[in-house]
Amino acid sequence: MAEIDDYILDVLMRDLVGHDRRPVSFLVYLWLSAEEARRGEAVEVSYQELAECIGISKSSAQVAVGWLNKRQLLTTKKGTVTATPRYTVNRPWRDAKLRLERKGRAAR
């Protein structure tokens, strides 16, 4: 079973579901995060497969991915326009924490 970062449940869920009113975006983020952890690499999956795995419509998956990209919580890459997207889950709170730790070490 994939581990869920505390930040995802404590902060991100409220932000996406409550503030942004995008619960499907939270489900997509959660599923992609778990799948990336299982595979150990970015997740290559079509909108249709993504939708079926989560139990949502294809158009809802497309909108959710677009929102997550806009929020910079997801990076999407495609080799060609018609290629299957490859998703990398971004965790900006971890990056910020690392920057602060490095800054603290450099100041010593």
Positions of PLM-derived features:
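Winged-helix/helix-turn-helix nucleic-acid-interaction surface
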Residues: Q62-R108
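Short recognition helix of helix-turn-helix/winged-helix DNA-binding domains
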Residues: M1-C53, T82, A107
